[in-house]
């Protein structure tokens, strides 16, 4: 479904990704792991057309090269950045409305689905998004991305700064998305959560892929964890 082959990325003259290759299959959660500065977020931005790239990025067999971010989104890839990127002066419900593809109703997700999945958002649907807690904002960012009816969600650090109970909820909801056939590229620092919910793990370091395997294989590889993941 999503395939990166020897992908390079640049910020101006800075060469930050060096031949990244990875795949995300239909209905799969792939955890993209690594320390800060390893290239994980840049990989997400490269997929979404937000940075200059060389190499191959394809989605469902079609090249993403030269496409604008909104064109990539319209093809079925949603991106939830680390800063969540919600509209703080709009209400929860208005944020969800803006997530709809071209203003059209999602074929897969309804407002009721969102409020059933996250009951707290139903209670806060007329509240400005800027006054929500961090956990509520993360729920809103995820739900807004779903309203565009994506097939793949790239989500960057969804558990950053959240209470343990909310972290568990986010993990449960990502698994629920997988159960409904969505693919997830999960950029995550919390190794325990990543190993618990992913089917494959990709570890990055210095802008390159340094490990790819199953969660069990990563658990068994103490050298990789020590070299590339431990703080």
Identify the meaning behind each predicted range.
Residues 1-231:
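Glycine-rich phosphate-binding loops of nucleotide-dependent enzymes
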């Amino acid at each position: 479904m999503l395939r990166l082959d020897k992908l390079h990325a640049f910020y101006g003259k800075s060469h930050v990704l060096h031949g990244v290759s990875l795949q995300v299959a239909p209905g799969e959660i792939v955890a993209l792991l690594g320390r800060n500065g390893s290239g994980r977020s840049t990989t997400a931005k490269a997929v979404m057309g937000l940075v200059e790239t060389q190499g191959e990025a394809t989605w469902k067999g079609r090249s993403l090269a030269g496409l604008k971010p909104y064109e990539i989104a319209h093809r079925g890839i949603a991106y939830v950045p680390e800063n969540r990127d919600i509209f703080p002066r709009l209400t929860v419900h208005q944020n969800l409305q803006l997530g709809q593809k071209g203003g059209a109703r999602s074929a897969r997700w309804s407002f009721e689905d969102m409020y059933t999945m996250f009951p707290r958002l139903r209670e806060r649907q007329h509240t400005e998004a800027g006054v929500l807690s961090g956990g509520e904002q993360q729920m809103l960012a995820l739900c807004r991305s779903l309203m565009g009816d994506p097939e793949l969600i790239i989500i960057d650090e969804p558990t950053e700064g959240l209470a343990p109970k909310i972290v568990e909820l986010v993990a449960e909801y990502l698994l629920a998305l997988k159960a409904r056939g969505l693919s997830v590229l999960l950029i995550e620092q919390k190794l325990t959560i990543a190993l618990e919910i992913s089917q494959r793990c990709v570890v990055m370091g210095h802008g390159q892929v340094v490990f790819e395997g199953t969660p069990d294989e990563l658990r068994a590889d103490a050298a990789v964890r020590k070299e590339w993941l431990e703080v």
